[in-house]
Each structure stands twice: as C-alpha cells, then as structure tokens.
A protein has these predicted regions:
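Asp-box/BNR beta-propeller blade signature and adjacent active/binding-site loops
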Residues: 1-252
Length: 252
C-alpha cells in the first residue's frame, strides 16, 4: 500500500490536474509555456541532525535551461549580502530587492516600500496577501490551451501574473524534513555561488553525498564547461562551493 503523495516543493500557479496528452506527431511535443517549476531534485540524509535535505532547480514562469538568463544570478550584492531582485509590472529594470524580514526595498531611494515577500515567496501589500488567478490547461481545436480557471491563489514572485517578478534565470532551492519526508519546511533559495553576473548552477539529479568520515554534505551541480560541488559542514545551514573544469569540450 502507498500513502498519498507529499510534495516537498510546489507552486500553485497552475491547477494540479490530470491531462490527456495527445500522442500524434503534431501535438505530442506541446509544452506548457507559462508555469513556474521545480526540476532535477537531489536528496540526502544528514546523519548529524537526522534531517532529510532536498535541493532542486527552480524556474520562474516560462523559464527552462534553454532560455534562462545566463548572465544574471537574480540577486544583488549589498554590503556582502545577496538580496533577491524584483521587477515591478510596467518597469524596464529590476528596481527592487527583498531585504531582511522580506521587506521590499526601492533601490532608487534605498527605502522600504509597503510590500513584503513571505517565506513562501508570496507578495503582500500592507500585510495583506495579494492573489492571482490560477491557470488550467487542456487541448482545444488541435492546440494546447493555457487559460485562467477562476480560482484565486496567493501571488508569488515566480508566477507569470505576479505584480513583482524575479529575474528570468534558474535558481537552487533547499527544503528539509525532520520526519523522513512525511512533511517539509518551506523552501528557501540558496545564494549565488558564481557571483552576481552568472546564473545558478544546475543540480545533478538523484542523491547527494553524506561523508562517513565527517559531517560534510556534498551535492554535485554543473554549468557550461564546469562542475561545481555545493558543500555544507553544518547540516545545510551554510554552503560553499568547489569547482572543477570538465576535461573535454562541448560539455554542459
């Protein structure tokens, strides 16, 4: 017997639904174009704390490996700290950052706004949660259709219709479980490991490493021409990286 599935990380911009996917040559390669997503997770059990630690690639609405901005981490460094950048609807530039306690700052004035982002990356105005309309998908008249379905869900900076949006690049998120996967903490984004002007590395999906000889955890990731190992010696509280070039050409 099996229990009901538990999602360690989940977005609600699109309905959780079963879709009959056509198998004909014309439609079988159709792709949903507007959803935020998680992909390529990797998991390990930390013997020191007993926690299960899961990392995954995070993609904003409509973004994947092929179209992610490779020259932007999505973060801004201020006084040695990295803060998530946001662009407001109607703006051409990313003029806002998410600072301590989730307060959204206007970078032009360096002053707080009336907006905040909570630990789920949802947007609030004056402490009140904002919403967007959820999407559903179906096939109609020989094409894939993505349509609003009338259900309001909390606005999230990774969503297509959010008032504030993150940079269209790839990120890495981490979540932990204290009960071997029965329930999970809210995910948090890891800081950039390759600087402000480089997108995040991509996780090698599957399993991380917990070394027997120490409390070290290691997750393998990759970027163009390079392997980058994410390392934690404190049960995932902090991370550092160690990179190695790939000894052959045309590798990603």
């Amino acid at each position: 017997t099996w229990s009901e599935p538990t999602f360690a990380m989940k977005f609600n911009d699109y309905e959780e639904q079963l879709v009959y996917w056509p198998r004909d040559n014309k439609l079988k390669n159709s792709q949903i174009s507007g959803s935020a997503s998680f992909i390529d997770s990797s998991i390990v059990e930390d013997k020191k704390s007993g926690k299960t630690i899961l990392l995954a690639d995070v993609m904003p609405a409509g973004i994947g490996n092929n179209n992610a901005n490779k020259a932007d981490s999505g973060f801004k460094e201020i006084n040695g700290h990295y803060y998530l950048k946001l662009k407001k609807d109607g703006d051409n530039d990313f003029r806002y950052t998410v600072r301590e306690n989730g307060v959204v700052y206007d970078e032009r004035t360096n002053k707080p706004t009336n907006y905040t982002v909570n630990d789920k990356y949802e947007v609030l105005e004056g402490g009140k949660s904002l919403t967007v309309e959820q999407y559903s998908v179906d096939f109609d008249s020989g094409s894939l259709r993505e349509r609003h379905n009338g259900k309001q869900v909390p606005m999230n900076v990774f969503y297509k219709d959010s008032l504030f949006k993150v940079t269209p690049t790839n990120y890495i998120a981490m979540t932990t479980s204290q009960n071997r996967g029965e329930s999970w903490e809210q995910f948090k984004l890891l800081p950039p490991f390759l600087g402000e002007k480089h997108n995040g590395t991509y996780l090698c999906p599957g399993q991380g490493l917990a070394l027997k000889s120490s409390n070290r955890l290691i997750f393998a990731t990759y970027t163009s021409g390079e392997l980058t190992y994410l390392i934690s010696d404190d049960s995932g509280q902090t991370w550092k990286k160690s990179s190695a070039s790939i000894p052959f050409k045309n590798a990603t």
